[in-house]
Amino acid sequence: METSTTTTLLQQERIPENSEPISTHIHTHSLPPTPPGTAKPSRIGSFHDLQELSSVESPRLDHIKPYPLPPKFSPKSVLKEDLKTPDNFVERDPRLIRLTGVHPFNVEAPLSDLYDEGFLTSENLHYVRNHGHVPRCEDDDILDWEFEISGLVENPIKMNVRDLINDYQQLTYPVTFVCAGNRRKEQNIVRKTKGFSWGPAGLSTALWTGVAIGDLLSAAKPKRGARYVCFEGADKLPNGYYGTSIKLNWCMDPNRGVMVAHKMNGNPLPPDHGKPVRIVIPGQIGGRSIKWLKKITITQEPSDNWYHIYDNRVLPTMISPEESANLPEVWKDEKYAIYDLSTNSAICYPAHEEKVPFTDAPASYKVRGYAYSGGGRRITRVEVTLDKGKSWRLANIRYPEDDYRNAPEGDTLYGGRVDMWWRETSFCWCFWDLDIPLDELKSADDIMMRAMDESMNVQPRDMYWSVLGMMNNPWFRIVIHKEDHALRFEHPTHATLKIKGWMERVKEAGGDLTNGYWGEKAPGEVQEVVVKEPEKQICMTNPQINRKITIEELKAHSGEEEPWFVVKGEVYDGTPYLSGHPGGAASIFGAAGQDATEEFMAIHSENAKAMLPTYHIGTLDEESRAILSGDATKTNDDADREVFLQAKTWSKAILDKKTSISPDTKIFSFKLNHEAQKIGLPTGQHLMMRLRDPATREAIIRSYTPYSDGSDCGRLDILIKIYYDTPQRKGGVMTQALDALPIGHWVDFKGPTGKFVYHGNGLCTINEKERRVRRFIMVCGGSGITPIRQVLRAVIDNPKDTTPCLVFNGNRSVNDILCMEELEELEAANPSRCRVVNALSNPPPEWNGLKGFVNQALVPEYMDLPKASGEGDELLLVCGPPPMVKAVEASFLGMGFKSDDFVFF
C-alpha cells in the first residue's frame, strides 16, 4: 500500500510517543540543560496527518545514548500574523522575534531562551532566514519531490526523496547554523547597512539526517574541469530562484560533512527549514545551505545567481550603501564572498537588564555564553576582561559536540549512522563559563570577552563595518551599572525594535562608537563638549508632489487593490512595487491603510528609503494624521457625561486603591468622574489602558477585561497579574509600571474594543454577526479568568437566561486559581446552569480536583454536564497564556470542534 510505504520511509526512527531517551554523560560544568529527548511528537506538527496514517510502529529510542538528544518541542499553530500572507499554512512559535515585520519570516529566539535550551535547539526556537514566502509541499508529495544533478557530469541524475532515503547510506550528526548577519544590529547602530538587524541569537544547533553529498556526486561522476557545485531552491523571488555555490572539492571532502538532509532533530524537515529536502554545509554561513532543494549543477565557474552575487559578501569598509549600488564588478569579485564562518562569541548571562543584588547573593557570579568558529576549526580559548583588555582571564570551555564522537561502533540515530568518531573537524558551537567574584564586578565598568580558534584567529577589538553588515565579530561587551542595591547589566543591543542597549544609549548621547573606546571617554581624556552631528537624512519624498490626502482616501486603499501606506505623514502607493518587493506583495498588503513609520524606519536600509520618492503620491493632512495616530495626546474632558469609556478618545480615571488577592495578583480600583457615571462596557468586550513607562516615558498600552461589571457606576476595578523581573527574564512592562503607580495617579482608558459581545439569553454577536449559543464551554488560566467571569456572571445573574456554562480553569497551583470561592458559589447555587472544573498541573498531595492540563485526554469525561439545550451552537470562550491557548485549540479541534467555534480573548 503506497500510504504505508510512504509513512514508513518518513517515520524511520521518528521520535516515538512515551519515550524519553536519556544521556549518561554527566557534565560538571554549568552547561544549560539539553532535555534528554522528546516525550512525544507534536500533534499539530507538519506531519501529524502522516503520523495518523502510519500503521508501522516507530523504533523506540529508549536505549541509553552518550550524547545530547533534542529538547522537547512544543505544539505550534499558524499565527494570526501569518494569516494574510502566503505563509498562512506554516505553524510557528510565537516566542520567536520577527526582524523584518510580519513577512517574510526572519526570526531569532530570545537569547536567554536559546541558551537555556542547551546544546541542541528545538524546531520551535531555531532561527529562520527566509527571503520570501515558503514553498508549499503537501505531506503526500514529500517522497515524490524531485531534484536533479546535472551540468559537468557524465551521469546526470534526477531523483526524489524516496530514492535519497532508499538508495544511499543515511548519516546523522549535529551542525550549528549561523546567519552571516548574526550581531548585525551592532553595525546598524554605528551606521545603517543594507541588511536588517539581527541580535546575537542568529544561530542554532540541530541534529541533521541525510546523505553525504559526496556519495551523490560520485554517482553523477563530475567531469574534468568541474570546480563548483551550484544549488538552487524552489523559493521564487523577485530576482529569480534563490541559489548559490560552493567548491566541488569541499563537497567531495568527507571532513567537510556537506549533506543533503531530509530530517531535523529526528523529524521530517518543517516548512521553514526546507521541507522536504535541503543542503546542510557545516562551518559555513547559513546562506549557503539551500532550502527546498531542486537543482544541483556542477560548473566550471561560481554561480551566476543574483542572490549569490549580491548577498553574503563583505565588501571593503570604505564602500558606502550609495556607492555599492553602482559597482557590479565589485559584487562579482569572488574574493569578497563569504563561506567559512569567523570566530565569534557572545555573553548570554548576565542577560540584558538582569539585576544582581548586593545582599543575599552568592559571593561570585558565573558569567556564561557561547562561542563558535568556521571551516571545521575548534574554539581553543575564551578570554574575559574586566578592565577593557588590559588583563585577561581564561574561561572554562565545554564541547558537547565531542559526546557524539563517543558513540559506540554502528550506533544509529533517527535512521542515520552517527558519523563522528573519526572526524577532527568541529561543526558546532561550544559553551563557556567563568566565576567572577561579585566584589570584582562591583569595581568594574563592563565585562568583555573574546574567543580564539585553533588557527589562532581571535576576535578583533574593533568592528569592521561593511555595506551588508555581515560577519560582525568584535569583542562582546556588556556594561555594568551600579544601582542602589544591585548591579544592572546592559547588552550592546536587543533584537526587538523597542528595547535598547548601551550602543543606542551612547550614540543618542552624542558618543562616537568608532572612537576605539566604545563611544566613551578614555581615562585621562579631557572632557570636551560634543556637538552631535545630525544623521544624514535620506530624502523620501518627491518635491514635485503637493497633493493633500484625507483619512477617507487613505482608508479606501487599505486592501489589496492599490494599497497605500504612510511613513512620517507622507503617503505612498505600493502598487507598482508589489511584484518587486523582496518580501513579496504580502509585506505591502500588511501595511495598507496604516502608519508604517516605526516599522519601516527601523527595518529598511538607506537604499530602500531612497526608493520611496518613486512611490510618493501626497501628504496626509493634519486632521488625518491625528486620526491615524489614534489622537494619542487628546483626552475627553467632558467629566459630566453619562458613560465613561469613549471609543476614539482617551478618558482619565484616578487610581484609588490596590487590593492584593494573591502574591502576584492585585485588583486596581479606579475612581470615575462621578458616582453615577457608567463604565460603558458591553459583556465580552475589553478596554485599553495607557500610562507612561517610568524609565523611558514612552507610552505603554495594553488591553484588559475589568473585574467590574460593564454596567457598574462610579468605579472601575481591574484584576491584574503582575509579572515581576527575575534573573532569567524581564517581567511585564505594563504590570510592573501599574504596580509602581502611586495612589492618586491618573491612568488613561479607551474602549470598548473586541469582536465578541454577549447580549443575553444565548444570543451573541461575533464581528457584528449574530449567533445563537446553546452552551458555553469556557476555558481559562490565571488572570484569563476575567473575560470568562464577565460572561459567566452575565448568564447567571439573569434568572431568565438558561444558557448552560461549563468552565475549565487550568492553573499550576492552588494559589494561581483566581476568584475560586466566587466561582464555587456560582456553581453551588446554579447546578443546572454552571459547572466549574479546576485543573492543576502541579497539584499538592491533598488536591482532589483534576490533575494535569486542560486537553483532549482529560476534558471528554466532563463534557456531559451541564447539558446543552435549545437551538444554536456550542461556543468555546478561551483566555489564558499563549501556550495554554494553543494547546486548548488543538485539543478541541481534535474533538471535532470547528475553528469558528472559538472566541479567543
Curated annotation (Swiss-Prot):
Binding site for FAD: 702-705, 719-723, 733-735, 783, 786
Residues binding NADP(+), per UniProt: 875-884
GO biological process per UniProt: nitrate assimilation; nitric oxide biosynthetic process; sulfur compound metabolic process
Gene3D superfamilies attached to this UniProt entry: 2.60.40.650, Cytochrome b5-like heme/steroid binding domain, Nucleotide-binding domain of ferredoxin-NADP reductase (FNR) module, Oxidoreductase, molybdopterin-binding domain, Translation factors
Free-text comment on the cofactor: Binds 1 FAD. Binds 1 heme group. The heme group is called cytochrome b-557.
Domain Cytochrome b5 heme-binding residue range list: 546-621
Region (Disordered): 1-42
Catalytic activity: nitrite + NADP(+) + H2O = nitrate + NADPH + H(+)
Domain FAD-binding FR-type span(s) in chain numbering: 648-759
Coiled-coil residues: none
Keyword terms of this UniProt record: Disulfide bond, FAD, Flavoprotein, Heme, Iron, Metal-binding, Molybdenum, NADP, Nitrate assimilation, Oxidoreductase
Keyword Nucleus (UniProt): no
CDD domains attached to this UniProt entry: cyt_b5_reduct_like
An example Gene Ontology molecular-function term: molybdopterin cofactor binding
Superkingdom of origin: Eukaryota
Record EC number: 1.7.1.3
Chain residues that bind heme: 581, 604
Family membership noted in the UniProt record: Belongs to the nitrate reductase family.
Annotated protein name in UniProt: Nitrate reductase [NADPH]
